[in-house]
Curated annotation (Swiss-Prot):
This is Alpha-conotoxin PnIB. It comes from Conus pennaceus (Feathered cone). The record marks L54 as: Important in inhibition of nAChR alpha-7 subunit. The cysteine framework is I (CC-C-C). Alpha4/7 pattern. It comes from the Eukaryota. One of its GO terms (molecular function) is ion channel regulator activity. Residues 48-50 are annotated as: Ser-Xaa-Pro motif, crucial for potent interaction with nAChR.
Length: 61
């Protein structure tokens, strides 16, 4: 294989790795957002119950 061909293959591998890394990172961001929403809903449910709200003043204000 010539030097130019090896460099082209190297660039293709770097590009493919970057694309896979970028898309998997965005997928994990969506998962983190869903988990944060679930936690917020759970805390809001707790804050509507007086005993739970009293035992968690940091979250319920």
């Amino acid at each position: 294989m010539g030097m130019r061909m090896m460099f082209t293959v190297f660039l293709l591998v770097v590009l493919a790795t970057t694309v896979v890394s970028f898309t998997s990172d965005r997928a994990s961001d969506d998962g983190n957002a869903a988990a944060s929403d679930l936690i917020a809903l759970t805390i809001k449910g707790c804050c509507s119950l007086p005993p739970c709200a009293l035992s968690n003043p940091d979250y319920c204000g």
